């Protein structure tokens, strides 16, 4: 955090920035500043304009009007290359690495020869406490480590302005603390950080100033110490909410299709001594009508387990039983047809076709059941139903998924999974990068789905989310189930964290 009030000259000053898409005003005269050695947090609901503003600053998208003052010079527009030259680097919520290249190659990719310093990279790795095997493939990294590689790419370019988009969305509290420690070291060198997040406690911990965007404007801005939580929430909340379905319709949205019904409490998915990449000897039972939480530190094996259940990874041992039948040898498509549906952690690379229409994406898992060339009118009607149920904000069914904000993309992905009529729904970080209002919509929907006797496996790094939502909780530690299922009062953040660290062993993990 900023330690001196003498840093008067801003690193960045955006003035009167306007942007319009398809006749819709996305940014309406934004003013935004960032100083040396400070964290300026940017909050706002989905579609408030945060990502658009940051893309303009990073040179990805041009503004319609307005100026950017950087280093005392004014610019009407930037390109990504020019932004990098000026010391601006955007670390996206979904890190954009080359999975088939090594970590070292990813960090150095695109650098000019004069910037290709192995010693500099080693110094940065040491300063940030990272212990990567630089020769490992980037595709083997979890989300937390991919984010750190992105930050290292920016620092290798001598970036002075770092834009972090939801950097802690998939991190546990311990990993968040380690990230914040590293950010403090960067701030001490004069780097300025724009920190986009929906997590108010984290923002209060790390940010010097807060700006809240709503409907393309800055609705509130000030020093963190001078803004109350009520002020911030009120600024985020839309003045007028779109009229939606009634509470009962929204809460009890019926699943489509002729889905086999199970009585609540009936075992639907059983894992017997499962062993695979990143986990071993995992046994558990998931019952109809319950939300079973799966917690653990990043790297504990939760996502690897989920991908193995869905058939994306090879099973090395044990049995997967769905409705009493072994499905070890079934393909992903066959598991889907039997009602096993997976919502992946990384929505952009694994969940959505970003260039396809919203209607196509929502119905993507059911196209083969109706003939691949789906009926447009039916797809549009399906999309409209989920738009009302989840408050998805978009202009038209034909627009590409990549044009939506991150939170609305997540809602489209959830709709896609629900349209497949799941008996077992595995959701991996379902509220990652989603604002408070949308998060509550998703919570209501998951409860609604469980109330229809679907078995829900909830994987989340947000332990408060696990505590709020789960009926039972298993905790993974170093690839194994670390404890019998937690129930009742034992489902709390403190107990989950203790088990996640191997009971009382709170050893530090490397970056």
Swiss-Prot record:
InterPro entries: AAA+_ATPase (IPR003593), ABC_carbohydrate_import_ATPase (IPR050107), ABC_transporter-like_ATP-bd (IPR003439), ABC_transporter-like_CS (IPR017871), P-loop_NTPase (IPR027417). It catalyses: ATP + H2O + (2R,4S)-2-methyl-2,3,3,4-tetrahydroxytetrahydrofuran-[AI-2-binding protein]Side 1 = ADP + phosphate + (2R,4S)-2-methyl-2,3,3,4-tetrahydroxytetrahydrofuranSide 2 + [AI-2-binding protein]Side 1. The keyword Repeat applies. Residues 12-240, 240-503 form the ABC transporter domain. One of its GO terms (molecular function) is ATP hydrolysis activity. ATP binds at residues 44-51. One of its GO terms (cellular component) is plasma membrane. It is a peripheral membrane protein. Its EC number is 7.6.2.13. SMART domains: AAA (SM00382). CDD domains: ABC_Carb_Monos_I, ABC_Carb_Monos_II. Keywords: ATP-binding, Cell inner membrane, Cell membrane, Membrane, Nucleotide-binding, Repeat, Translocase, Transport. It holds the Pfam family ABC_tran. PROSITE patterns: ABC_TRANSPORTER_1 (PS00211), ABC_TRANSPORTER_2 (PS50893). It is found in: Cell inner membrane. Part of the ABC transporter complex LsrABCD involved in autoinducer 2 (AI-2) import. Responsible for energy coupling to the transport system. The complex is composed of two ATP-binding proteins (LsrA), two transmembrane proteins (LsrC and LsrD) and a solute-binding protein (LsrB). NCBIfam families: PRK15439.1 (NF011967). Belongs to the ABC transporter superfamily. AI-2 autoinducer porter (TC 3.A.1.2.8) family. This is Autoinducer 2 import ATP-binding protein LsrA. The gene is lsrA.
